[in-house]
Amino acid sequence: FTSNLDEFFMIRVGSLCDMAAVDKEHTDSKSGLTAKEQLHLIYKAVEPLYARRDAAFSDVDSKLSAIGLRRLTMDSLAPDEQKYIKRYFKDIIAPVLSPQIVDSHHPFPHLEGKVLHIAALLSHKKTERLGLLPVPASLPPVVFLPETPSRYILTEDILLAYADHVFEMYDVLEKTVLCVTRNADIQVDDETFGVEGGDFRKKMEKLLRQRRRMAVVRVEISRPISDHFKEYFRSRFEVSDAQIFLSRTA
């Protein structure tokens, strides 16, 4: 479900977003709807699917936990496990982190599609800032506990818990795991590559670079956040509330 939905947003929703921007009055011959109307119905239909997916995952997770394979949170770790994770964070995770502060001197960085980030609303001397912490691709997504390997915790959950430590100079007002999906509907034709051939590899690399920087079509967050916090994402990514989805399951 998740990978199919990703592809649907990247290609179909991406294509509709392009059409909505170029020709707002054009109607689809099959549905009789404009691109904007189709997008509205898609967003409305997709939101409850997230809840169904999360409920299905929770059911499977409970059944796995019953037979000993248990996904943990920082709050559910035993004292010795908390000590292990604290050392693991200090020795393995912290050295490869690249936290970023968004303010008047540091513009909002480009976020690649389908890359997890910890986003934190920060406060210092009555001034709010946004903190971003990419989840490093070099780290394993899952950390298994040494004494009982059937007990594990997600790396993103560790980072979310330690966001207060990473941004220790600030008060962390809110935080969430953040993931954006970008439009990937790039039209490739003979003109793009040239009928004469040429360096296909360089042209494909250019297309892939273009794909990574295309418009955001979906924003996923791991927990409910305030409308004030959402505004950072709405304004930066130029998305509506309908494009911000609560996704409790990674």
Feature-to-residue mapping (PLM):
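N-terminal non-catalytic structural scaffold regions of very large proteins
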Residues: 1-250
